[in-house]
Structure formats: structure tokens, C-alpha cells
């Protein structure tokens, strides 16, 4: 009976040992290699939101900015715009406005712009890593290079998407301004029309 129990427990012991060894030898995300491997894992799992923690800070902030502005913009459109513009424009902002946080905004863009597909095609094992201060470059065995920057918390963040996301955040801010001006105009016109109806012809 005891031998049978040992035979049953042996595979679990092997699995536990493998897990502990893997965990102990897996590079920290406070190294460029560790951050790169976590991005690779998330890409292979088709979960771009899972490597949001491994993009640089400016890109993360941009994702939150996009989501916040799109929520505000869509809300103003629904409040003040007349049809058919209200339904059309509200639908165009629906995805970003419906995102619960920056990681979901990032996932939307990663899929929409083909970033995930590109990473899946190009990513492979690490060949070499070059570090210069707070910047690093991870070169893969396929010859692709991935730039990283060390963030304030010590985690390395991929910089590939920063410029695009910052530009999109700036566009979201401009769009919000334009929509707010138009919404105010629509409300003013409705208010004037309402007063005219109440006062009647003179």
C-alpha cells in the first residue's frame, strides 16, 4: 500500500521540482531578457493585455489617456449630438470607451494595428542583450532587435509602440476638444429653439 502511494506521489514530486527549478532560474522582469520572455509568453498565448506591464511608462500612460478621452468624448456625443451623427460617431468610439483600463486599450490597438501578429512572426529565442544605462536591446536568434527602457519601478518596458500610442493619445485629446465645442454649439441652438417655442411669435 505504501509503495503504491509512493508511486502515485512520485510524478507530483517531479512536477513540483520542475516548477521550483523553472521558477528559480526564470530571469527576473528587472532584466531585459526576463521582460522579453514575458512578452513572448503573452504573445504566444494571444493575450496582449498580459504584457501591458512590459511596455514603457509613456506608452502605458498614453493607453489610459486614450481610454479616458474616448469615454468623455462618447458621453458628450450621446448627450448633445443630433442623429444620425450621434449614433455613427458614438459607435466609432465605442471600443476604446468601453475598455476598463489601459491594458484593454493596449490590447485593442495591438490587434487592430497588427502588432500582435508582427510579434508572433518575429519573436524567437534570445541571442544577445546589449545594455546601455536605462536602455537595452534584445537581439533574437532570427536577428530581430527589440528595444527596451528601464522603468521607474525597475521593470524593463518594450518601447516599440510608444510613439504610436502617444500620437493616438494626442489625437484623442484633440478629438475631445472638437467634440466638446460642437456639443456646446448643439446645446446652445437647442436652447435658443426651446426659448423661441416658449415665447412664440412676436
Regions found by a protein language model. Name each.
Residues 31, 100-105, 159, 200:
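Secondary-structure junction/capping motif
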Residues 11, 16, 108, 148-150:
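Intrinsically disordered, low-complexity regions enriched in Ser/Pro/Gly/Gln/His and often acidic
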Residues 84, 96, 100, 112-113, ...:
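Short, flexible helical or helix-coil boundary motifs
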Residues 8-77, 177-179, 200-201:
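Short, low-complexity N-terminal intrinsically disordered segments enriched in polar/charged residues
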Residues 1-6:
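Twin-arginine (Tat) signal peptide motif
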Residues 48, 52-129:
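Short solvent-exposed beta->alpha transition segments
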Residues 18, 22-25, 29-30, 35-36, ...:
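Mixed-charge, polar/low-complexity N-terminal
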Residues 118, 124, 133-183, 187-188, ...:
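Short beta-strand edge/turn micro-motifs at domain boundaries
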